[in-house]
Amino acid sequence: MRKILLLFFVSSLFANNFEISPKNISQCKNQICKNILNHYANFMKKIEHESFIRKLELINSYLNSLMPRYDDFYNTNVDVWSTRSEFLRRGGGDCEEYAISKRDSLKDLGVDNQKCLLVVQEKKTKKYHMVLAVWENLHKEPLILDNLSFRVLPLSKRYDLVPEYCLMDGKYFKIKKDGISLEPINIRMQTYENLIKKEKEEKFWKN
């Protein structure tokens, strides 16, 4: 009985009650912003026990419903990417901010699988774009969550995209020709490193 109680106590310490931090709420400038944050928190509570695939589908669809704002990813003079808090408070963002917010949402839902911010090139337009790549396991190709698509598909089924490089845990990789494994590459992106610094200083949830 003591072991059961101890396990329950320890698990409750690390449980996420999905309650927005007061500091996060205080940075809202209007009621719409507060409503977005609270609705997101309730959504996270609702889906926390869904399956791996279902979580990916639901998070992708939910965040894709927020308005895109094409304001900075293609502008080389802007070196700021928004955190999940900033993205939600603003009620939308650019492609990289959808990918960042999906990554953080899945992590908070207990999806600890390997995931990276994947920079791709669109074959048709030749423009660069960012999506979230998530590996169900390291022997399978990643699944792609894209703000331009409500479907979660394996990378090989995204015929319209060419993977360029992958940002994960402060490091840089490229996806090998097998479409599954990663290889370190020697590049640096100041925008990504600035994002990491901001995220370390930010407290999204109350607990």
Question: Which residues are covered by each model-predicted region?
Answer:
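A structural boundary/capping signal
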Residues: 15-207
